[in-house]
């Protein structure tokens, strides 16, 4: 089977979608021919030593918000199944036009007003046959939204993690260290983080750490430290000795960062977005704070802080339960399901 995976950003952008592609393509390439195709948009650095073909095309715009990926045509000629991220305006028509079989991957909620307008036009007027394509969702919640729209060829397969790479370390009991991966812009909630951190400055033993691209705010509170853009090994090492993950995000489908932190035994305080709740379920190790509610985010943080400070055994139990949640998403369980999805689509016609 010959497979192509398309996404707009360069793989070096290194967010959840890019991580998903690299892991999936590496796994599938053991048995199948795999091409990954992206544009050079958001390229951070060159990538070497990949065990699949990586093709980078020039990022172009048609007009307005629409992207031009017409160059992709020549690379899809001999492909049996094309997997394309659904989020990019203007890309779906050419994917449908040049592909034999298509799976559209839904890795973003698409709930913004402009997205709702575009996809309503696309699905109901411009390209109605898109409902007859296969669609991959990360959560039952998001899949149900599309079932109500008339989509029937649906796969639900969650994100995954290489559990053996993420090992819990002995937790610190001198400082309560809170990791905030990717909380660098408004969508991820940096404004909320700043307000929360300022409110908690009276606690000398609470510290916040940000990883990822440079935050949009230059002057952060004294109890917030920016650690920079880390490679995978550095990132795992950093999160493993933290005590809590805090993610006040405003939009999320299935955050890899939550999965990674659960795997190293960190309890989580995250916004109560329906996709996230659907992804992980209700557990004592995860606190779903009311979206945009500074007070409730603080409530969640202080809940785990008090347990950490006053009841070490209970905190260790929560840490162990966090790891147990992550174990359900081990790549050894999920990656074969993704391969099976491709096989079913390949054999469908």
Give short role names for the model-derived ranges.
Residues 136, 171-188, 194-197:
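Conserved donor-binding/catalytic core segment of Leloir-type glycosyltransferases
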Residues 117-135, 149:
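Membrane-proximal helix-turn-helix segments that form the acceptor-binding/catalytic region
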Residues 141, 160:
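Carbohydrate-associated surface elements
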Residues 84-90, 106:
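Short His-centered aromatic/hydrophobic patch
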Residues 250:
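Aromatic "clamp/platform" in nucleotide-sugar-dependent glycosyltransferases that forms part
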Residues 229, 283-295, 304-309:
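Conserved acidic donor-binding segment of nucleotide-sugar-dependent glycosyltransferases
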Residues 267-270, 277:
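Short hydrophobic beta-strand element within catalytic cores of glycosyltransferases
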Residues 7-15, 22-23, 27-64, 272:
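N-terminal strand-loop element at the rim of the active site
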């Amino acid at each position: 089977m010959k497979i192509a995976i398309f996404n707009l950003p360069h793989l070096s952008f290194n967010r959840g979608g890019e991580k998903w592609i690299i892991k999936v393509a590496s796994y599938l390439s053991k048995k199948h021919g795999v091409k990954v195709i992206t544009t050079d948009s958001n390229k951070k650095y060159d990538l070497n030593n990949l065990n699949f073909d990586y093709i980078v095309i020039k990022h172009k715009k048609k007009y307005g918000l629409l992207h031009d990926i017409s160059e992709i045509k020549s690379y899809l000629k001999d492909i049996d199944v094309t997997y394309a991220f659904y989020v990019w305006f203007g890309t779906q028509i050419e994917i449908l036009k040049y592909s034999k079989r298509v799976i559209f991957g839904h890795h973003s909620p698409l709930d913004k007003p402009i997205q709702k307008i575009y996809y309503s036009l696309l699905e109901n007027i411009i390209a109605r046959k898109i409902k007859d394509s296969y669609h991959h969702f990360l959560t039952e919640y998001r899949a149900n939204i599309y079932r109500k729209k008339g989509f029937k060829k649906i796969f639900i397969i969650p994100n995954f993690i290489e559990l053996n790479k993420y090992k819990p370390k002995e937790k610190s009991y001198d400082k309560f260290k809170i990791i905030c991966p990717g909380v660098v812009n408004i969508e991820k909630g940096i404004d909320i983080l700043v307000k929360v951190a300022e409110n908690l400055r009276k606690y000398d033993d609470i510290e916040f750490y940000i990883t990822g691209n440079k935050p949009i705010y230059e002057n952060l509170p004294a109890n917030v430290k920016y650690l920079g853009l880390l490679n995978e090994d550095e990132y795992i090492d950093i999160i493993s000795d933290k005590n809590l993950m805090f993610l006040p995000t405003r939009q999320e489908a299935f955050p890899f960062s939550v999965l990674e932190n659960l795997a190293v035994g960190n309890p989580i305080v995250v916004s109560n977005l329906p996709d996230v709740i659907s992804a992980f379920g209700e557990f004592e190790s995860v606190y779903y704070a009311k979206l945009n509610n500074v007070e409730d985010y603080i409530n969640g943080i202080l809940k785990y802080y008090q347990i950490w400070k006053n009841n070490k055994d209970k905190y260790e139990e929560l840490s162990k339960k966090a790891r147990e949640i992550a174990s359900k998403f081990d790549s050894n369980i999920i990656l074969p399901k993704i391969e099976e999805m491709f096989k079913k689509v390949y054999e469908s016609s």
